[in-house]
């Protein structure tokens, strides 16, 4: 189980990313439209003004049940060992077992 502070930090980053999403997206499209280099630098400065934790690259996918940040399966939102346990216990409909 991941520490609660790490899970809270991820939640905070997700909120910040959603808050500043349109600012980042609009400034990125604006950079591509502007022909002059000096204007691009000004827009790039605006792009750097939001907090670092609002960047989508800083988000991690975490396991829904344990909070583990590694070996997550996107389709299920679970880490590998929890997924295996749930499949063996027939808790995930449609998932077939394999000998791994």
From Swiss-Prot:
Cellular component per GO, a single term: chloroplast
GO molecular function, one term: rRNA binding
Residue ranges the record marks as coiled coil: none
Keywords annotated in UniProt: Chloroplast, Plastid, Ribonucleoprotein, Ribosomal protein, RNA-binding, rRNA-binding
Disulfide-linked positions: none
HAMAP family, alphabetized: Ribosomal_uS14_1
PANTHER family: 30S RIBOSOMAL PROTEIN S14, SMALL RIBOSOMAL SUBUNIT PROTEIN US14M
Compartments reported by the entry: Plastid, Chloroplast
Quaternary data: Part of the 30S ribosomal subunit.
Plastid listed as a keyword: yes
Family named by the database record: Belongs to the universal ribosomal protein uS14 family.
NCBIfam families reported in the protein's UniProt record: PRK08881.1
Main location: plastid
Keyword Ribosomal protein found: yes
A UniProt-annotated Pfam family: Ribosomal_S14
Gene Ontology BP terms: translation
Known role: Binds 16S rRNA, required for the assembly of 30S particles.
Name recorded for this polypeptide: Small ribosomal subunit protein uS14c
């Amino acid at each position: 189980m991941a520490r609660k502070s790490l899970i809270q930090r991820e939640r905070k980053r997700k909120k910040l990313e959603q808050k500043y999403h349109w600012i980042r997206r609009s400034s990125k499209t604006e950079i591509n439209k502007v022909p002059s280099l000096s204007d691009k630098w000004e827009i790039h400065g605006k792009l750097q003004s939001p907090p670092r934790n609002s960047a989508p690259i800083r988000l991690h996918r975490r396991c829904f049940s344990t909070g583990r940040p590694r070996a997550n399966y996107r389709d299920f939102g679970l880490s590998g060992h929890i997924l295996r346990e749930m499949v063996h216990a027939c808790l995930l409909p449609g998932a077939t077992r394999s000998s791994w």
